[in-house]
Structures are given as structure tokens and as C-alpha cells.
Amino acid sequence: MRKLLTNLPAAAVLSAQVYSAVLQGLWEENVCGTPGRTRVCTALLYGQVCPFQDSTDGLRTITSILFNWPPENTSVYYQPPQRSSFRIKLAFRNLSWPGLGLEDHQEIVLGQLVLPEPNEAKPDDPAPRPGQHALTMPALEPAPPLLADLGPALEPESPAALGPPGYLHSAPGPAPAPGEGPPPGTVLEPQSAPESSCPCRGSVKNQPSEELPDMTTFPPRLLAEQLTLMDAELFKKVVLHECLGCIWGQGHLKGNEHMAPTVRATIAHFNRLTNCITTSCLGDHSMRARDRARVVEHWIKVARECLSLNNFSSVHVIVSALCSNPIGQLHKTWAGVSSKSMKELKELCKKDTAVKRDLLIKAGSFKVATQERNPQRVQMRLRRQKKGVVPFLGDFLTELQRLDSAIPDDLDGNTNKRSKEVRVLQEMQLLQVAAMNYRLRPLEKFVTYFTRMEQLSDKESYKLSCQLEPENP
């Protein structure tokens, strides 16, 4: 990065989206609050070239902008700049400024403001200010993905199958509670899988069954680490403004399937993991009740390991899947689960449903950081703690949807509403920084198995559950 800056003398380096926004003047009020920021933004607005490689204030200002401006889909907030007095040269580069809290943060667009040739200036362009040069600006290139994909890409889920904002609901059908069975819980609406005449546990498309691993062959700690890695990568990619009720809440309407793609990708992963757990318990017709009990115990151990990794997302999904109707009504299976595992499951249910926000604050250790006004100091403090945290995104979606529907968009209540929404998004932003502290490696064998595993649909799961352990007449 330092070498690149050296090769760009007198260059203003910033993301292309932020550059366009500053040209529109949309950030003057919110960003230009300090003298250093005022100098930088004023220079950008009037076409001056700032040698940021020699300016600590400039580096800190760009750091703050990068952390607070939405990295994708910025067309929601502004239109492309109409001015033709600027020119920007783009390059893609991993940003790393030691000491400023941006190590391994994201891949960004680097831009260089350059002076055009004299014949490039258009006669109808507005006259530049005294002492300044006229510049031209071509169309910006699209930014690359902010984070590298984890191993093989997850299979795309059908957007139409993702539920509306109230996607947390109870699964259909009766839910008889086993003797020591877990309490009923809310689950994500599972993604419907293609119909299969004979579903097989752990069956993977286009591979012979004898080569397939059993889910229980993966140690609980390894499973927890791989799930945590997937959850962390997805959560870091979530674009915060897509979680707002006014955006995500409209995604289920016809014609809005393209809205909130990062949120939809995260929910699709929730659904896939839920179906994976259900299929591992029900998909093999040769399994007996005691075999299914061992699988249930295995997933309880995985959830416990996820909790030790502060992966509250997978903890919620695993507990919800085990408490769903297809698995929860297996009386013989639950009778074979050890008392120790049942006790652990009850503790997991209690921690999953009670005081989630307090657990997140304690796990992420950012209670003090939220009171810090300097954004760079907050980021550096979280990075030094080296504690990774992955929250359950559904909690934030539910809260933001409630704020959007409960508080009207009138003049009196709008300020209060937006303040509460911003507070939630700020917490999510801090947790995204904490999610960067994981140092885990993907296991190709597990990723391939997880992404290509054939899964049971809702109807198949419930029907098979009733066939394996029918209710007493």
C-alpha cells in the first residue's frame, strides 16, 4: 500500500463511492465536522489534489469515511455525479494502514485525481475556481466484492423462497412434546429442496454414496469452526442499510426480489443449515431411534462449541432446528438422548432466548467502545481484543422492522425513529468489526459436503418424521 501511494504523487486515495458522494455534497454536514475533515472534503469538492500519503489527518479522514459509508448499492442514497470537471483513475487494492484499524478490512477502489490534457476540457463546463485546474471524470468502474468468498461458493437460493420480514414462525403441523424434549422454539422458514423419491442422509449430488462422509464423522469442534467461518464471512458482507425495515421489509413484494441481496444470502445460509440438521436426523431410512439420538447429541455438542466461539447465529439455528416439529416429535429418539445432553440443550435454549443483546455486548467487549466518539479508536480497540463474535442477524432484522412499523414517518417522530435505527446499525457495525477477529481456515471437504448436500423439503421432513416414529393411535 505504501509503495502504491508512493507511485501516485499528489493523489487523493478513497473509495469511488465515497468520492462520488462527496462530489454531490451529501457528506458536508455529517463528515466535515472537524477541521481536518473539512480540509479534505473541501479539497475534493473543488478539485484540489491532496497528497494524503504525507498527511496523517487525510489518512484518518479517509479511514473514517470508509468505515461509515455503505460499501455497496450507494445509488440508494445519491445519484451519480453530473459534474464533468473531475477525472479519476481506478485500481483495486487490499487496504492496509497499520495503526488506523484497517488491517485486512476490505478490498476497496483506489482513485487518483489527475489533471486532464488542455484539449480535454469542454467549453460548456463550468469555469473552475480561481487558482484551480479543470478536470474531467469518466464513468466509475464497478467495485469488486468486498470480501473473498469462502471456498466453493454457496449454491444460490431462490429469492422467492425467502420469507417476508416476519419469517420467524413455527413450523406447520402438531408439536407433541417428548418426555424430556426441548421447548418449542421459533425457526427460520426452511428453503424448499427439490423433491426426491428416496432421500438419503448426507447424499451429495453427482457423487456415489459410498464416498460420502457422515455428518457425525466431523468432530463437533471442527463443525463449529467451519460454521463460524461461514457465518462470520456472511455477516461481514451484510450491507447495513439493507437491514432497515423500509428496505428489507419490502423485499417480499413482487418485483422487489433484488432488494437486500446480502441479507437474503445470510438467511439462505440459515435455511440450508436448518435443512442440513433435519436431513442428518431423518434422511437415512436405516437409522434407528438410538442412532438418531446420537445425531441429536452430536448437534448439541456442535451448538455448545459454537457458543464457546461466540457464534450466536449457529447456536440459534441449531437449537431451533432441534426444537422444530419434524425432530421435536420423535419421542423414541428423545428418550434415547442422554440426560447430560438434555441438560446442555436446555441451557442453550435459555441462553438463546434470554438477554441476547447483553451476551453480545459481553462477548464482543464493545460496551465501552460504543461510548467512544472517535471511530478509529473504536475500531482499533475492538481489533486489539481479538475476540470474534457473530450475532444472529434475525434479532436485528426483527428490531429494525418493528421500529419501521411502530413509529410513523411524521415530522414529530421521525428524528426519534432514525436515532433508534442508527443506534442498532452502529451496534451491527461494531459486531462486524469483531467478526473480523476470527482466524479460521475453511475445510474444503466440509464446505463441498455442506453446499452440495441434498436436503429434505418441509413436507418431506414432516412426512418422514411421522413415518419413522408414528404417533400412537
Swiss-Prot record:
Chain intervals with Low complexity compositional bias: 134-157
Pro residues compositional bias, start-end: 173-185
Every Ras-GEF domain range: 219-471
Subcellular compartments: Cytoplasmic vesicle
CDD domains, sorted: RasGEF
Domain of life: Eukaryota
Region (Disordered): 117-215
SUPFAM superfamilies: Ras GEF (SSF48366)
MF (Gene Ontology): guanyl-nucleotide exchange factor activity
Cellular component terms per the entry's GO annotation: cytoplasmic vesicle; plasma membrane
Pfam families assigned to the protein according to its UniProt record, in alphabetical order: RasGEF (PF00617)
Keywords carried by this UniProt record: Cytoplasmic vesicle, Guanine-nucleotide releasing factor
InterPro entries in the record: Ras-like_GEF, Ras_GEF_dom_sf, RASGEF_cat_dom, RASGEF_cat_dom_sf
GO biological process: Ras protein signal transduction
PANTHER family in the record: GUANINE NUCLEOTIDE EXCHANGE FACTOR, RAL-GDS-RELATED PROTEIN
Designated name of the protein: Ral-GDS-related protein
